[in-house]
Amino acid sequence: MPPPASSVDFSNLLNPQSNPTESTPSSPATPVDSSKGPSTPSSAQSTSSMASSVSLLPPLMKGSRPATEEVRQDLPRPYKCPLCDRAFHRLEHQTRHIRTHTGEKPHACQFPGCTKRFSRSDELTRHSRIHNNPNSRRSNKAQHLAAAAAAAAGQENAMPNNAGALMPPPSKPMTRSAPVSQVGSPDISPPHSFSNYANHMRSNLGPYARNTERASSGMDINLLATAASQVERDDHFSFHAGPRNHHLFSSSRHHGSGRLPSLSAYAITHNMSRSHSHEEDDSYSHRVKRSRPNSPNSTAPSSPTFSHDLLSPTPDHTPLATPAHSPRLRPLGSSDLHLPSIRHLSLHHTPALAPMEPQPEGPSYYSPSQSHGPSITDIMSKPDGTQRKLPVPQVPKVAVQDMLNPGSGFSSVTSSTANSVAGGDLADRAF
């Protein structure tokens, strides 16, 4: 029969010590079944050679496990759970089981910014591999969260409070059964998370890092006002300031936030707006003084806003006697008369500035009707270079004989003028 022949060949391959002439190799297979255990009683009862040969594999794979379980069942279980009826061989197993009832998780992850805790040390070990593997997607997400939390923790631990005492360390117990991660300050990150460390340091060194993080936590409302005013000043300064008008703009940037519509309006409300600017500076400096000495705002270089009194070309005690180079006010009316005629007319034709020009309080010290010749401004404004010459002084036309004869009817003023013009020694030569 072909099937028994194939079964005999297969049994010979599995059991080379058996006699190949035997037609029923079930006899060597039955001791194996009986020795391995009672898990496969059907193989011992089977009379088919194919079934007996194939049934050799399951006892080899399954026979050892029930034996070990029986051995473990025989061990004593002295450690019983007080909350349930379970008992354990070792004290560690009982302690780990009791934590499932109480919810205690003493094993905390020491990675900067990670707040997870575990009741078993092997769970903490498995969790720490997430931080140690930079290629994991969970690791990347956890690193971003850890960087933000580490920055906040570093801010709170690095800065002292207003009383001068250091803040207490975070209340995390350091007791754990497996030394997996580093124990130390949250500012120190492991070498594998250099990007987190760089982000953390960058957020610490940034001038507004404390304002944004502390404002998000809602601890101090004054920090919101400080950050808002600082951002507004910086935005306005970056829009208007340049290398050419940095000196001029630093003196007038207090009024550049859209509060005053025009320069002429500022000319009328000059004293009032300047007093408001000082009140604004005082309130802002008061908020700065209330902040901690280690804050980035107090250590940052001072902006041109705070050098208002030093860089201002116009002193505060002379609001009406503004010099001509001041960027805040236009020159007074008396100085406008020195301008050329076309510029003089263009200034007075401006409808918005004409009624708002400040007028001098005292009498005019200069009258254009007193000048008979061309002014210096007219000479310098001529396009032709040959015409830019000073005129020759107009000397009274007096003949030499009249100058030599003082008694010919000239007055003393004329003779004195002639003597001064001619040199004063012509009369002496004549006599």
UniProtKB/Swiss-Prot annotation:
Start-end of C2H2-type zinc fingers: 79-101, 107-131
Compositionally biased intervals (Basic and acidic residues): 276-285
Subcellular compartments: Nucleus
GO cellular component: cytoplasm; nucleus
NAD among keywords: no
Record-level GO BP terms: carbon catabolite repression of transcription from RNA polymerase II promoter by glucose
Region called Disordered, residue ranges: 1-74, 272-337, 352-431
Keywords: DNA-binding, Metal-binding, Nucleus, Repeat, Repressor, Transcription, Transcription regulation, Ubl conjugation, Zinc, Zinc-finger
UniProt entry tagged with the keyword Kinase: no
Family annotation (InterPro entries): creA/MIG_C2H2-ZnF, Znf_C2H2_sf, Znf_C2H2_type
Pfam families assigned to the protein according to its UniProt record, in alphabetical order: zf-C2H2
Main localisation: nucleus
GO MF assignments: RNA polymerase II cis-regulatory region sequence-specific DNA binding; zinc ion binding
Mod. after translation: Ubiquitinated. Deubiquitinated by creB, probably to control its activity or amount.
Biased composition (Low complexity): 16-31, 38-61, 293-307, 405-422
Family: Belongs to the creA/MIG C2H2-type zinc-finger protein family.
Primary role: Transcription regulator component of the regulatory network controlling carbon source utilization through ubiquitination and deubiquitination involving creA, creB, creC, creD and acrB. Represses the transcription of the alcR, alcA and aldA genes by binding to a GC-rich region in their promoter. Also plays a role in response to carbon starvation and the control of extracellular proteases activity.
Known partners and oligomeric status: Interacts with creB.
The name this protein goes by in its record: DNA-binding protein creA
Organism: Aspergillus aculeatus
